[in-house]
Amino acid sequence: MVKEIASWLLILSMVVFVSPVLAINGGGYPRCNCEDEGNSFWSTENILETQRVSDFLIAVAYFSIPIELLYFVSCSNVPFKWVLFEFIAFIVLCGMTHLLHGWTYSAHPFRLMMAFTVFKMLTALVSCATAITLITLIPLLLKVKVREFMLKKKAHELGREVGLILIKKETGFHVRMLTQEIRKSLDRHTILYTTLVELSKTLGLQNCAVWMPNDGGTEMDLTHELRGRGGYGGCSVSMEDLDVVRIRESDEVNVLSVDSSIARASGGGGDVSEIGAVAAIRMPMLRVSDFNGELSYAILVCVLPGGTPRDWTYQEIEIVKVVADQVTVALDHAAVLEESQLMREKLAEQNRALQMAKRDALRASQARNAFQKTMSEGMRRPMHSILGLLSMIQDEKLSDEQKMIVDTMVKTGNVMSNLVGDSMDVPDGRFGTEMKPFSLHRTIHEAACMARCLCLCNGIRFLVDAEKSLPDNVVGDERRVFQVILHIVGSLVKPRKRQEGSSLMFKVLKERGSLDRSDHRWAAWRSPASSADGDVYIRFEMNVENDDSSSQSFASVSSRDQEVGDVRFSGGYGLGQDLSFGVCKKVVQLIHGNISVVPGSDGSPETMSLLLRFRRRPSISVHGSSESPAPDHHAHPHSNSLLRGLQVLLVDTNDSNRAVTRKLLEKLGCDVTAVSSGFDCLTAIAPGSSSPSTSFQVVVLDLQMAEMDGYEVAMRIRSRSWPLIVATTVSLDEEMWDKCAQIGINGVVRKPVVLRAMESELRRVLLQADQLL
């Protein structure tokens, strides 16, 4: 609406101003009423000539401007092109008007005047149209100006934001550089000094210091500083200081006054004029904080150079905050690493100790294995050979005295064999027992004979007193009973060797009266399968008596048995005897007994009492029973008819044992072929060998062989269902028996191999094989 009103007002003003001019001039052009001054420069002719030249020059200028505008419009995307085209037309018409006007100063034809008039009218119309168009464009141009102002403002804001971004980028660069330098080391002192140096370089600081709380938490101590202190001697600030309290309570950077005590101390202790602006921030010490939520803080103080109007900027404060956080984390990591390093060193030390203990254990195991091998080769195998030979001698026709001596030798050999076996089984805590029927009277008689020999050899008199009412047929471990009795005799005789007037009293009696069944030491004896009527308790008491002192009564010994059962000896008895007594006591407990000791005045044992429980065994009936002992060989002269002519292959790596076992088998009537290894055994029974493999009916196999043990040989034999296998082994428990049964071994004889044990096992194996067939 405003644009239309402005256009009509412009047209109306032109009509108002042009009409009077036309009326005044009567419709024609005014004529100049000038006087020509003749020869003057400003003569009429000169003026007209000058105007004509000016018109031509104006026309040339007007014609050149449209060319430039046309080139500009064609080369760029300019808004309002139609306005520019109006300007071009207006300028061209103006140029034509001036050009034609230049020809009218002299005599000219009517057509020129007519053309001049037409172009002038066109110029007037175009100029009016252009003016009207400009009126409509002015508001748009004003909007463009406003937009220009807005763009300038936005450009200014953008420049400011770019500046902030550049500042942040620079700050980030400094922070990354400082963080990288801080994290290069894992030592806390190096971390702090690196922080001080790099932060001072980055921010151009005069000094930089770290304050930490003392052990009591009452003061802040200056612990790390970039530059040494000057004349100011204070290096501690109280925790109650206002600046310290303000810093510790705020997590922001605090700008301190130069008069502050912590600021002066951090600035090197010099003049206040030499210190610039001071900033401080707390650093949490995570590793020394308690679990109640109370944190411990260190303080980082940064001092700007003095004598300059420089102050802390936002960028510098942000750098200090980030560096403080990074230092806190780095110190915490360093503390964790120190603890880890200490733990690693402790673990390494423990590992070295474990390795040393492992080597010691390995050496001990090797020494034990060497000891066991030596004991086995040097003592156990020869003892087994001797016992085997003695078993053959027992089968000969001997007088009663000779038979008693041989039987005593066999019992003593069994004790020796048990001792050797126990010495090898002590580290494992295993002591084997073998419960079987035996004659108690014969065992007591043989033990008394052996004790008498020991006493006479040591110059001590020996007395024996055994009740006639003692049962004879009992069930127990005969070898262990004999071993314990000999140990007691040796323990009493050895400390009094060649002592004048000493005598050893050996008494055996049946325990009468009721025992205290609630005693924990007797609780292990009782079992649901046994009743009180089927058990018998026998007490073996040995007492050393001197002629010049009254002997200890056996009744008192029996009454004090419960009190002194766990006595350990000292003095002359010694640590070795004490250990031996401990082993003996363990053996006694295994055979359902208890042992007690009464020490003498010198600390050596004076009285020892052994109480054992045996199972009663019914007397042998005329028809025999399942528990009856094997029939005597002389009473049954044809008992070996089953074994006579039996083809046996004997496999044993020990020459002496192999020879003794061969003699035993030959005495039983077997035809024996002996080999010294498992390979020779497999070769001997293999098809196509020089030996007739089908003639071997039984293979007697030693399980403890060096190159190829008996288990592997037995498995190879059983893979083709070859002859019956009877194994010989040192120790036989339920686990070993199950293993032998799984492999296919038909029978097992425990070493030492004696005649009757071998005969009984071979007979059982052959009868079982016949029943299966």
UniProtKB/Swiss-Prot annotation:
InterPro entries reported for this sequence: CheY-like_superfamily, ETR, GAF, GAF-like_dom_sf, HATPase_C_sf, HisK_dim/P_dom, HisK_dim/P_sf, Sig_transdc_resp-reg_receiver
GO terms of molecular function: ATP binding; ethylene binding; ethylene receptor activity; metal ion binding; phosphorelay sensor kinase activity; protein serine/threonine kinase activity
Tissue: Expressed in seedlings, roots, leaves, flowers, mature siliques, shoot apical meristems, leaf primordia, inflorescence meristems, young floral meristems, developing petals, carpels and ovules. Low expression in stamens.
Compartment(s): Endoplasmic reticulum membrane
Membrane-spanning ranges: 4-24, 53-73, 82-102, 122-142
Modification after translation (UniProt): Autophosphorylated predominantly on Ser residues.
Cofactor: Cu cation
UniProt-listed Pfam families: ETR1_N, GAF, HisKA, Response_reg
Residues that bear 4-aspartylphosphate: 702
Listed result of changing residue 66 to L: In etr2-1; ehtylene insensitivity
Keywords per UniProt: ATP-binding, Copper, Disulfide bond, Endoplasmic reticulum, Ethylene signaling pathway, Isopeptide bond, Kinase, Membrane, Metal-binding, Nucleotide-binding, Phosphoprotein, Receptor, Serine/threonine-protein kinase, Transferase, Transmembrane, Transmembrane helix, Two-component regulatory system, Ubl conjugation
Binding locations of Cu cation: 94, 98
Domain notes: The GAF domain is sufficient to mediate heteromerization.
Quaternary organization: Heteromer with ETR1. Binds to MRF3/ECIP1.
Role of this protein: Ethylene receptor related to bacterial two-component regulators. Acts as a redundant negative regulator of ethylene signaling.
Note: ETR2 is degraded by a proteasome-dependent pathway in response to ethylene binding.
Name used for this protein in its record: Ethylene receptor 2
